[in-house]
Amino acid sequence: MLGRSTIMESPLRFGLIGVGRHGSRYAKHIHEDLPQIDLIGLWRRNTGEGKRQARQYGCRYFHTYSDLLADKSIDAVVVALPPALNVSVCEEAAFRGKHIHLEKPMAINMREAIRIRQTISRYGVRLMVSQTLRFNGVVIALRARIPPLGPLHSLHLSQRFEPSPLAWLDRRDLSGGGIVLHTGVHSFDLLRFLTGMEVDKVSCWVNSVVTKETEDNFSAIMTFEKSDIIATVMGSRGTKGRNGLIEVAGENGQLIADHVHNYLHEVRGMEWKPIELGNPVPTVYEILKAFCDSLCREVPFPVTIEDGVIAVAIAEACYRSTETGTWENVSYP
């Protein structure tokens, strides 16, 4: 089947595939904040909850995602499922001519990420990966202040959360991995977004604090192509507290921020200068709006398929490092 034209007119007609914890955030913003989207229908595995949500949002409940994708009135879909399902759903969506907003991680491994990329190319539709931290107000403000730091020396990123209530996250057959894949991809993408450089080598360690099948705690050291910058990345889903720490150090000073607690400081010598920030930005709203704007204006997505593929490539290199106990190269396709 040939993909539909990439030029769209507002309101765009959307379907939601997966309306659980993450998918519900998309549904809420579409219903309350995005008049440029007309929600046609949704599907989730829990039929009772799916029907209730369809009534709540004034749309149709589809009994299978294939039925939703077969609806010719739908222009685009948001896919927010356990990532082991992404390949089959994206292949069918592309075949049906639907543009795709895909929740991260794009895939559970490089093989499946490349397969999705090939599918999108074959059918002429468009896909954007939901790397929402690029739209965080703290991240945007920090990125704008990096050039005055001069040559960069090091970066440190840390994301920590409480144990997840989602049972499927600790089922490897559905999740494909633990915090390296599901949260690490945010940090891996931010390294590239903040520096404009590609990660070259990684050395990674993992363990399990609460989980049984997957890791919920990791630390990694990363180096970059054509640069002496050293980065450390950490993540945990086993503590009773949250953070989203970002530290960037350059020749002329440092930036220290937290995208969870909404603060940013410039550091020169012993002086910490707080940077005034607005209220926290709802990143799901911002990225959905950007997805719609890009479709309607026929301009590139701010997060590309390649961005999604590369985040998975870095995660895969981390997993190889945990197995070999050595530095591993990031394999770029």
Where are these regions (language model features)?
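Beta-loop-alpha module in the N-terminal Rossmann-like domain of NAD(P)-dependent dehydrogenases
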Residues: 26, 57-119
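Predominantly a Rossmann-like dinucleotide-binding segment in NAD(P)-dependent oxidoreductases
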Residues: 133-211, 325
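N-terminal Rossmann-like dinucleotide-binding module
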Residues: 2-57
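Contiguous beta-strand/loop segments that form the cofactor/metal-binding neighborhood of enzyme cores
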Residues: 182, 189-262, 285-299
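C-terminal helix-rich "cap/oligomerization" subdomain common to oxidoreductases
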Residues: 1-11, 76-79, 122, 293-333
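Basic phosphate/pyrophosphate-binding loop/patch that engages nucleotide-derived ligands
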Residues: 118-126, 140-153, 225, 250
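Hydrophobic residues in well-ordered beta-strands that form the structural core
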Residues: 63, 101-102, 127-129, 257
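Active-site loop of classical SDR/Rossmann-like NAD(P)-dependent oxidoreductases
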Residues: 45, 278-289, 303
